[in-house]
């Protein structure tokens, strides 16, 4: 493989400089860490990355294995959602893209063209995420997704997230106060799982979402 040979040769030059004590810097450790990682030497890659974090006083970005994990998640989960015909799937895809560490590296011209071809609502959500616009309705949907994402068992459950977007839009249409998203997400999760083989108890959800039994019951009634 020509890429492997080129990376191996580059690694030999970098290591030679490192051993001779030349140009010992954050850039050198960074190059060593990335080259070690892609040559299959993760332990040495971690060692070099640790040196960066020890000497740097500023944010040094993400380690190569973190970026590689983001690439895997992007290709297997995010991209299919962004290309889906259903706009709720696309919104969830935009949300997941925003969660990825080192996402800037993934933003090729092809990905930008996909995002630029989306509808106005999806572009508005992108702008909300990037620029921090005050958009109460999209903010409510987003905060709900963020709460779901914080739970490991939910974070890649596509049907749960797209159902939440649909449910959130119905809640918004009722013109209720949208500040307290936790009560709505807790009630939504309870109703989503109540007929499953592993339903959540109200006590579990009260603890997980810091919601009182009264609020949870009232919100379940409201959604029903």
Labelled PLM ranges:
Residues 1-16:
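Single conserved hydrophobic/aromatic residue that forms the stacking wall/gate
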Residues 7-11, 42, 90:
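TPR-repeat structural position
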Residues 145-185:
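Intrinsic, low-complexity N-terminal interaction/targeting segments
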Residues 102-123, 177-224:
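Extended intrinsically disordered, low-complexity coil regions enriched in Ser, Thr, Gly, Ala
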Residues 8, 30-35, 60-69, 91-101, ...:
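Structural detector for internal amphipathic alpha-helices that build alpha-solenoid repeat scaffolds
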Residues 19-28, 54-65, 90-91, 104-107, ...:
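Boundary/linker segments of alpha-helical solenoid repeat arrays
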């Amino acid at each position: 493989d020509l890429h492997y040979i080129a990376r191996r040769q580059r690694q030999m030059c970098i290591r030679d400089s490192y051993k001779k004590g030349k140009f010992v810097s954050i850039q050198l450790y960074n190059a060593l860490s990335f080259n070690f990682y892609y040559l299959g030497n993760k332990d040495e890659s971690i060692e070099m990355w640790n040196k960066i974090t020890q000497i740097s006083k500023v944010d040094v970005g993400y380690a190569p294995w973190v970026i590689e994990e983001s690439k895997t998640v992007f290709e297997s989960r995010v991209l299919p959602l962004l290309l889906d015909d259903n706009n709720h799937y696309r919104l969830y895809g935009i949300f997941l893209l925003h969660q990825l560490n080192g996402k800037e590296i993934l933003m090729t011209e092809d990905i930008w063209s996909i995002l630029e071809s989306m509808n106005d609502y999806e572009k508005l959500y992108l702008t909300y995420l990037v620029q921090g616009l005050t958009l109460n309705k999209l903010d409510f949907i987003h905060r709900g997704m963020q709460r779901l994402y914080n739970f490991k068992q939910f974070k890649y459950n596509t049907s749960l997230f797209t159902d939440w977007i649909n449910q959130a839009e119905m809640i918004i249409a009722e013109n209720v106060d949208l500040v307290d998203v936790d009560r709505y997400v807790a009630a939504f999760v309870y109703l989503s799982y109540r007929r499953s083989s592993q339903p959540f108890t109200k006590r579990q959800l009260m603890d997980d979402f810091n919601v009182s039994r009264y609020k949870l019951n009232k919100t379940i009634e409201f959604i029903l």
